[in-house]
A protein has these predicted regions:
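Long C-terminal interaction/binding lobes of large macromolecular proteins
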Residues: 1-239
Length: 239
């Protein structure tokens, strides 16, 4: 006699980028095991494969292309899947800014963490009086690299590669150049032609991009100094 099937609960959330409602389920034990093993391996390729497979498996709504979602959608989705899978509260250790040493444990309800949007954010970047550029958001691969890459901090070369991968098109009144028709080298050379003011506009795009954000109040137990801390990005909440 076969064993009974265990019912898996389903949940809904609204994607921050397009306000569409999607259905998802928690990790199964076998999926969580694969994810933990991949992260413990410190192999970025294994982590990439595991995270992709877990997110794709847990999203139940048809027609959702996970690879095409903006990075902040993926962060929000992954955080919610994790919350429904292993507990809807996470404890993180925050370094008290007044002494830079003391670790203060803080419990955060995952449903309180939202994607914050900046009113000054704009995907259209004006390069000069004639030329414009339209940006896209980092891909699923880039999201994984930012949150799980064990190689250390992002260097200048990686930063330029990230920027180049997010340029969707360059255009003026008469012509449009799609970067999908260009080589990586051509896009990188285009970037290197920019002056510092033009490049600052790109930095502003990334600096104002929607992101997971949550503000917490902490008290250093040693100095009794109170501090307000803004946590940003998935890695800040990954315990």
């Amino acid at each position: 006699m076969p064993l009974p099937k265990i019912a898996t609960p389903t949940y809904e959330l609204v994607l921050p980028s397009n306000k569409k409602t999607i259905k998802y389920r928690p990790f199964l034990v076998k999926e969580e095991k694969l994810l933990v093993l991949a992260i413990e391996s410190e192999d970025t390729k294994q982590i990439t494969t595991a995270v992709k497979n877990v997110i794709k498996s847990c999203v139940l709504t048809r027609g959702v292309k996970v690879e095409s979602l903006p990075s902040f959608d993926i962060e929000f989705l992954f955080l919610n899947i994790r919350g429904k899978s292993v507990g809807e509260e996470v404890e993180v250790n925050i370094t008290a800014p007044d002494d830079g040493v003391t670790q203060v444990p803080v419990k955060i309800a995952l449903d309180e963490i939202k994607v914050q949007e900046d009113e000054e954010h704009n995907k259209q970047i004006k390069l000069d009086d004639n030329l414009m550029m339209e940006m896209g958001y980092p891909s699923l691969d880039q999201f994984i690299s930012n949150n799980f890459d064990m190689d250390g901090e992002m260097n200048i070369e990686k930063s330029f590669e990230l920027i180049a991968s997010c340029i969707e098109k360059i255009y003026n009144q008469d012509e449009v150049w799609s970067t999908s028709d260009c080589t990586k080298k051509e896009v990188m050379e285009f970037l290197e032609q920019m002056n510092s003011l033009q490049f600052k506009e790109i930095e502003k795009f990334f600096g104002t991009m929607p992101k997971l954000s949550h503000t917490v109040e902490i008290v250093n137990p040693n100095t009794k100094v109170e501090s307000t801390i803004v946590l940003e990005g998935l890695s800040s909440f990954f315990a």
